[in-house]
């Protein structure tokens, strides 16, 4: 068992869970993702089927920004994995998708205007997920 700090409960330490816990730690510690804006095992409905996104990262206004799909290290990241996360994105319409098996990581940025996506060379910092908007306090 391992304590999932986001779900605040102990969960079975499966190979996939090991990948999730390390990846979440990386996002929070090295990429500046706020722990309070990440949800693990988020339930969604795709068509008539209930599914669970492994992790969803939210913006400060509670809008979903990123879906992360984890696989155990011995599972290859095949087209089937990308198809799975794409189905989840049909519901959430995020700009960022990540698939990881702990050994390989792929980050994609959606390009909805051109109905395609781009593989990114690195996983973005949290501040790179959305254009920053600065508010001048005199305009409020």
Q: Where are the regions a protein language model picked out?
A:
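A short, conserved, highly charged catalytic patch centered on acidic carboxylates
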Residues: 1-96, 103-140
